[in-house]
């Protein structure tokens, strides 16, 4: 229909800002330059398509820096793009909204006991649905980049890495199971991620 959104192009560029944030609490000048350069290119693409409205969001990599507001201002001054910083719950809401846009298929799946695992750079959000209702949602600080930086900080050799990740994940997941999963049997798992797929 007339008011339906249609994808014309899909352009992606990965910049792992979180690896700086989770290690030092700051984003390096080099990564900031990369980000601003990329956003300028996106601004040019939007201009060529005559885009009249856009949304640019920042998540935990920017939210958890020591100077979030300064970064926001610097990005806007250098690129003309205003980045809105999302809270964890706002970010997850948008992710779930995109899944729910799949319509009847999504509703049918979450009628049964379903876990949505939202895997990000800073954390994993586990949300449980049953009978078409959100039962619980919990954030575990087991994101891909956060774990990577922790392993780098611990100077873990490749043989130790798997064991350390297993220990960290098992400890948090065991606590999660005791507190939230209890005796629920999960029928479906939906994975939302930026890191597992290419």
Question: Predicted regions span which residues?
Answer:
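Acidic, divalent-metal-coordinating active-site segment for phosphoryl/phosphodiester hydrolysis
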Residues: 122-125
